[in-house]
């Protein structure tokens, strides 16, 4: 296990992902006062496949931003005119190429977060949504709930989000979200 105090993130993968990241296991950590808890990040043009990531038994306290974030628009660097946050959904979505980042097969369990700005933020790409993410047996106490964009095959199994502001869960272009 590990203890992370007052850093940018407790556990971070990215943003330069051209070689990808595979088969990573993180267990038994404490993140106290970090900017984010778990963060995986990339953007168009960096490519790479991030897959088979296992994270379990994580305690977070006083996270300044998101407890758990996957962001494929990292650093607000979307490609203009590609149906991203700065354009219309009617604009053409770019084709998938070797420069398109891909995040899939992520297995997260036994997360406890006592205090964060937002519990969960998933922000995939229209042309490459986040795919096959399982979050199990977790509790998030935060100001804001969860926001999911461009994601598919998501399982929240025994996930409790206790937020003091806004909706518990906001979805935009999410396919096959199961809550048990």
Task: Label each PLM-derived region with a short phrase.
Residues 1-180:
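Extracellular/periplasmic carbohydrate-active domains that bind, remodel
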């Amino acid at each position: 296990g590990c203890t992370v105090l007052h850093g940018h993130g407790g556990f971070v993968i990215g943003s330069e992902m051209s070689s990808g990241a595979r088969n990573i296991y993180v267990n038994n950590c404490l993140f106290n006062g970090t900017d984010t808890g778990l963060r995986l990040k990339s953007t168009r043009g960096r490519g790479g496949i991030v897959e088979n990531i296992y994270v379990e038994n994580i305690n977070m306290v006083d996270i300044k931003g998101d407890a758990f974030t996957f962001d494929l628009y990292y650093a607000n660097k979307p490609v203009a005119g590609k149906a991203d946050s700065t354009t219309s959904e009617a604009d053409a979505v770019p084709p998938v190429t070797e420069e398109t980042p891909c995040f899939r097969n992520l297995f997260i369990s036994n997360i406890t977060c006592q205090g964060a700005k937002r519990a969960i933020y998933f922000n995939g790409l229209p042309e490459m949504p986040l795919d096959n993410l399982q979050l199990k047996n977790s509790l998030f106490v935060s100001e804001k709930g969860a926001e999911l964009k461009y994601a598919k095959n998501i399982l929240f199994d025994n996930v409790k989000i206790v937020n003091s502001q806004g909706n518990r869960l906001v979805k935009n272009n999410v396919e096959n979200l199961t809550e048990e």
